[in-house]
Amino acid sequence: MDMMKFAPEPFKIKMVEPMGNLNKEERKDAIRTAGYNTFLLKSEECFIDLLTDSGTNAMSDRQWAGLMLGDEAYGGSRNFYHLEETVRELFGFKYVVPTHQGRGAENILSSLTIKPGDYVPGNMYFTTTRFHQEHNGATFRDVVIDEAHDPNAILDFKGNIDLNKFQALIDEVGAERIPYICLAVTVNLAGGQPVSMANVKAVSELAHKHGIKVMFDATRCVENAYFIKTREKGYEDKSIKEIVHELFSYGDGCTMSGKKDCLTNIGGFLCMNDKDLYIRATGMVVQYEGMPTYGGMAGRDMEAMAIGLRESMEYNYISHRVNQIRYLGEKLDAAGVPMVKPSGGHAIFVDARAFLDHLDQKTDFPAQALAAAVYEFSGVRTMERGIISAGRDIKTGEDHVPKLETIRLTIPRRVYTYAHLDYVADAIIQLYQMRRDISGLKWVYEPAVLRFFTGRFEPKNGELIKGF
């Protein structure tokens, strides 16, 4: 691999945290104690932690300095007004409602806009997003293009909405039963795949023609903007900031987890242009999150979010961010490790069904088994994103069976170097040579809701990796 393709990290390291790596027997005991669920491992038990990029970012010196400007007033914190001003400028929406994280924004949006019997279309489900939609009585309908479900389909914009599917849903149930379309930029479970600006425009036109709102899941919007700049004709000379602003000009609002592209450890917000929705949302924030000028966040964290959102739109940063993902993907792909292609904006998704093709998706849970095996073998923590994450149908109780059965190798922002990624790649490549020795799993405890967070399992064959 030509390292000249990959520029070094565009930052200097001012503070370090020691990393410990448990020995093999300690790792085997740790994953057993965690019920073979990587979510239940302790942080100190993980050598390299790729569980998520949510809230695991390294903040900059400017953000740390901003913490000292924290105004912790119960009402009217000046940090909120800085955040509000920043979001209005960069996103273009009229109203900003702070929440403790993206999940809080999802809850408010779903509670205020959905009524029982509604349908919410979107470009692939996300776990918590669909939960809030279904909890409030809606049915989620996937209207992403078919190629998004094919790990080997190579497209520049694999997260696009299929306009024919969207129109078919409108014809089937009526626009009055569709409060909004949830447009994720990027699409997490498709592999961090982006949506083109042309597709966003077309979706906006179709939705607004029928009186349907366009609500973005804006969590990784900066990564999406980078792909538009580098892949879509006519945007190569536009700044990331300009692209983000245009992107959101086609929508009516967004939910945002500040724990991703705001480069912070906590926080989120809900945006909208509808004044009535804003008034009702602030009322709900008071009930569940806090005052409308802090929404469950400390003032210092709102300040860090405002600074981080600007930093994330600096080209040197976002280029390095996406290239780290590409670097890891190219190493795995060159060794024949099956993965979702092309690599996305925040993670590499290893195709667990192809990796462990001796296991049955419905009864052996290959993604859950592979995530546990990667940890036991190397100390690297990853995340299951397959049938366990998909959960059960709220009406029938049957498992949702996703076409993609993956583990997610999620790269925290500004945390790991290329040397760390080399270790991850080498470990997974070695494990791939031992893949036939990995056992399937069975349930020991299945929670009723969002089961992937706290569910517990055990190997069907007694040991997870035979002879290891």
From Swiss-Prot:
Annotated GO MF terms: tyrosine phenol-lyase activity
SUPFAM superfamilies: PLP-dependent transferases (SSF53383)
UniProt-listed GO biological process terms: tyrosine metabolic process
Class of enzymatic activity (EC top level): lyase
Record-listed N6-(pyridoxal phosphate)lysine modification sites: 260
Descriptive protein name: Tyrosine phenol-lyase
EC number: 4.1.99.2
Lyase in keyword set: yes
Domain of life: Bacteria
Subunit details: Homotetramer.
Lyase found in the keyword field: yes
Family under the similarity heading: Belongs to the beta-eliminating lyase family.
Keywords: Lyase, Pyridoxal phosphate
Necessary cofactors: pyridoxal 5'-phosphate
Catalysis: reaction(s): L-tyrosine + H2O = phenol + pyruvate + NH4(+)
